[in-house]
């Protein structure tokens, strides 16, 4: 039995549009992304959220569907920290930008919290399994950190950087040093 996976991103309609390419390159550089596909994935997710908001805005303000689904959508965005709690109207969803989502990525927050020297170092730390969110070890740089989880961001207890077991190279060096010490005796 095969699964039907939905698309996670859309490629641009016009492949060689200078303004778009420059804007994407700026985002890739600023947030230390691997490729443009990461930008397109966020753009697609944002487009789906904005589409849902537009569909709800067309409905009457007293419509139960608009009230229920609108509050659920707003709650989701508030939890992610993409929108401030004070902005609790559907109109504000239409003003969201790709940067708002990029700011909530684990990679960006690791760098901004001072756990990494650069945005690229943050990605290396995450992929190297050195970062945890709460008690959960996370090795996905694009992981969107919730507001309540942000204060629990830190180095994993198993990481050599946090005083865990030394890494492969450190163990090898220690072994070499101990064998040299025995030869001298």
Swiss-Prot record:
SMART domains: Ribosomal_S4
PANTHER family registered for this protein in UniProt: 30S 40S RIBOSOMAL PROTEIN, 40S RIBOSOMAL PROTEIN S9
Similarity field: Belongs to the universal ribosomal protein uS4 family.
Annotated compartments: Cytoplasm; Nucleus, Nucleolus
InterPro entries: Ribosomal_uS4, Ribosomal_uS4_CS, Ribosomal_uS4_euk/arc, Ribosomal_uS4_N, S4_RNA-bd, S4_RNA-bd_sf
Designated name of the protein: Small ribosomal subunit protein uS4
Recorded GO CC terms: cytosolic small ribosomal subunit; extracellular matrix; nucleolus; small-subunit processome; vesicle
Top-level lineage group: Eukaryota
Start and end residues of each S4 RNA-binding domain: 104-182
PROSITE patterns: RIBOSOMAL_S4, S4
Pfam families according to UniProt: Ribosomal_S4, S4
Subunit structure, interactors included: Component of the small ribosomal subunit. Part of the small subunit (SSU) processome, composed of more than 70 proteins and the RNA chaperone small nucleolar RNA (snoRNA) U3.
Keywords: Cytoplasm, Nucleus, Ribonucleoprotein, Ribosomal protein, RNA-binding, rRNA-binding
Gene Ontology molecular-function annotations: rRNA binding; structural constituent of ribosome
């Amino acid at each position: 039995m095969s699964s039907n996976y939905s698309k996670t991103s859309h490629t641009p309609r016009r492949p060689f549009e200078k303004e778009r390419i420059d804007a994407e390159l700026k985002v890739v550089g600023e947030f230390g992304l691997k490729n443009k596909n990461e930008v397109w994935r966020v753009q697609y997710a944002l487009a789906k959220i904005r589409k849902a908001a537009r569909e709800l805005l067309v409905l009457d303000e007293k419509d139960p569907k608009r009230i229920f689904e609108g509050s659920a959508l707003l709650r989701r965005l508030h939890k992610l920290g993409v929108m401030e709690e004070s902005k609790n109207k559907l109109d504000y969803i239409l003003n969201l930008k790709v940067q708002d989502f990029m700011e909530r990525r684990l990679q960006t927050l690791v760098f901004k919290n001072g756990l990494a020297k650069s945005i690229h170092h943050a990605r290396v730390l995450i992929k190297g399994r050195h970062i945890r969110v709460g008690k959960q070890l996370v090795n996905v740089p694009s992981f969107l950190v919730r507001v309540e989880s942000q204060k629990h961001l830190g180095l994993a207890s198993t990481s050599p950087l946090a005083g865990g077991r030394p890494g492969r190279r450190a163990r090898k060096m220690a072994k070499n040093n101990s064998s040299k010490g025995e030869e001298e005796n």
